[in-house]
């Protein structure tokens, strides 16, 4: 299965969310040796912030775009094509100040394109166009908030992904990463165990 992995931690190999993604991929390859995997590190190669110049480029007719605007649209097109091609998408997401990293938000802004990844019906109802994908959101969090009012990140991600048509979303969280060595090890082990439970069901 064609799998796209999106890393977003600034900590590189010290990242707990990356550790979850690495574990996921290792187990996935055991069950699917012929997996076609693409990894995009949004921290190592960040997507520019979605600013006025970006919006202007996307809303300017193709034949009227400047070279700079064409480059912006080309990046958005490439990110979208990569996402469209994937049958499975794995988001490795650290929690920064109760929310997702800015680099992941920028990515989502670049792939949310009216008429390409979502559209509105004649009745004004939004319809996501990135349908039929398995999505796994692997979260690392310093404290413990999953399923509580303190967790605003998970509902946002589910809403945003659902808006784009990705409704089959499984969330796995390693919590307590900043609550001491024992709590961190326990939280990571529990998340990895949950991945191990799910992997045989992926196909």
From Swiss-Prot:
Listed binding positions for FMN are: 9, 15-17
Instruction: Please list the cofactors this protein needs.
Output: FMN
Per the record, what are the reactions this protein catalyses?
2 a quinone + NADH + H(+) = 2 a 1,4-benzosemiquinone + NAD(+); N,N-dimethyl-1,4-phenylenediamine + anthranilate + 2 NAD(+) = 2-(4-dimethylaminophenyl)diazenylbenzoate + 2 NADH + 2 H(+)
Q: Which UniProt keywords apply?
A: Flavoprotein, FMN, NAD, Oxidoreductase
Molecular function as annotated in GO = electron transfer activity; FMN binding; oxidoreductase activity, acting on NAD(P)H as acceptor; oxidoreductase activity, acting on NAD(P)H, quinone or similar compound as acceptor
InterPro entries for the chain:
Flavodoxin_fold, Flavoprotein-like_sf, FMN-dep_NADH:Q_OxRdtase_AzoR1, NADH:quinone_OxRdtase_FMN_depd
Give the E.C. number(s). Answer: 1.6.5.-, 1.7.1.17
What is written in the cofactor note of this entry? Answer: Binds 1 FMN per subunit.
Listed Pfam families: Flavodoxin_2
Membrane-crossing segments per the record: none
Q: How does it assemble?
A: Homodimer.
Which HAMAP family does this UniProt record tie to the protein? Azoreductase_type1 (MF_01216)
**What family, per the record?**
Belongs to the azoreductase type 1 family.
Outline what the protein does. Answer: Quinone reductase that provides resistance to thiol-specific stress caused by electrophilic quinones. Also exhibits azoreductase activity. Catalyzes the reductive cleavage of the azo bond in aromatic azo compounds to the corresponding amines.
State the name under which the record lists this protein. FMN-dependent NADH:quinone oxidoreductase
């Amino acid at each position: 299965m064609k799998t796209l992995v999106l890393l977003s931690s600034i900590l590189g190999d010290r990242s707990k969310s990356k550790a979850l993604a690495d574990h996921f991929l290792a187990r996935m390859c055991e069950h699917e040796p012929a997996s076609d995997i693409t990894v995009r590190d949004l921290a190592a190669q960040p997507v520019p912030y979605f600013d006025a110049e970006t919006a202007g480029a996307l809303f300017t007719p193709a034949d009227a775009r400047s070279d700079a605007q064409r480059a912006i649209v080309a990046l958005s097109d490439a990110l979208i094509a990569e996402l469209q091609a994937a049958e499975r998408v794995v988001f490795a997401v650290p929690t920064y100040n109760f929310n997702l990293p800015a680099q992941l938000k920028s990515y989502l802004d670049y792939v949310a394109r009216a008429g390409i990844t979502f559209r509105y019906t004649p009745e004004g109802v939004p319809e996501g166009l990135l349908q039929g994908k398995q999505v796994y959101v692997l979260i690392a969090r310093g404290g413990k908030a999953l399923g509580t009012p303190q967790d605003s990140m998970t509902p946002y991600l589910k809403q945003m992904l659902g808006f784009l048509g990705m409704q089959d979303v499984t969330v796995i969280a390693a919590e307590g990463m900043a609550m001491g060595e024992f709590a961190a090890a326990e939280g990571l082990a529990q998340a990895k165990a949950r991945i191990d439970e799910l992997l045989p069901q992926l196909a």
